[in-house]
Structures are given as C-alpha cells and as structure tokens.
C-alpha cells in the first residue's frame, strides 16, 4: 500500500511541477503572440496610413486641376437682368436698358450686340 501512495505522490508532484512549467510556457507564448500581434497591427496601421496619404494626394491633385480649368465667374444669359455697374453677361451679349416692352422695368438686361 505504501508503494501505491509513494507512486501516487510522485505522479502528483510531477504533474504539478510540469503543469506549472506548461503554465509558464503558455504565458511566455501568449506574450510572444501579443508582441507579434502588436507588430502586425503596427504594420497594418502603417500600410493603411500610406494608402490614405496616397488617396489624399490624389484628391488634392484633382481639386487643383478642377480649380485651374473651372470658370472664375458664371456669365448671365440673354434676357436675364444684369447690373449696369458690374455686367456679367456672356460673351457676345451686352448689358443694356430694355427697349419698348421692358421700359417699365428699372433694371438692365443682357442682349445680343
């Protein structure tokens, strides 16, 4: 009976000591994995940041192209009221006081030259 107790005690001590070693190893593995995970996250974050910077550069480039090609001021079409001091009539039109049918209106209109 003593041999059974000694054997059981020996197996118990080995299990506890190996179990703690496994626990320490598991803790070390978890730390390594979290460190690797952090490095992967840093890598992914840097990659995402680069992509966002490229997108931003493209968008800013498109904005600058649009501003170069866009009209500075919109022009006023034919028969539309205009300001006598600041005419914005389209090319080929002149800001004039209306004749005949529009004489009761006190504003100027864009007419063909």
UniProtKB/Swiss-Prot annotation:
The keyword Signal belongs to this UniProt entry's keyword annotation: yes
Tissue expression as described in the entry: Expressed by the venom gland.
Subcellular locations according to the entry: Secreted
Propeptide stretches in the record: 22-74
MF GO annotations: sodium channel inhibitor activity; toxin activity
Positions of disulphide bridges: 75-90, 82-95, 89-110
Region forming the signal peptide: 1-21
Keywords per UniProt: Disulfide bond, Ion channel impairing toxin, Knottin, Secreted, Signal, Toxin
Stored InterPro entries: Toxin_22 (IPR012627)
GO cellular component, one term: extracellular region
A Pfam family hit: Toxin_22
Function according to Swiss-Prot or TrEMBL: Probable ion channel inhibitor.
Family listed: Belongs to the neurotoxin 14 (magi-1) family. 01 (HNTX-16) subfamily.
Domain remark text: The presence of a 'disulfide through disulfide knot' structurally defines this protein as a knottin.
Name of the featured protein: U11-theraphotoxin-Hhn1a
Gene source species: Cyriopagopus hainanus
């Amino acid at each position: 009976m003593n041999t059974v107790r000694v054997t059981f005690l020996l197996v118990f001590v080995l299990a506890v000591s190996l179990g703690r070693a496994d626990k320490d190893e598991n803790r070390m593995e978890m730390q390594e994995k979290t460190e690797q995970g952090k490095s992967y996250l840093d890598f992914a974050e840097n990659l995402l940041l680069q992509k966002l910077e490229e997108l931003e550069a493209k968008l800013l480039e498109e904005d600058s192209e649009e501003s170069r090609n866009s009209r500075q001021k919109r022009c006023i079409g034919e028969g539309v009221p205009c300001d006598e001091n600041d005419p914005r009539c389209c090319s080929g039109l002149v800001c004039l006081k209306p004749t005949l049918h529009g004489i009761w209106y006190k504003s100027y209109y864009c007419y063909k030259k």
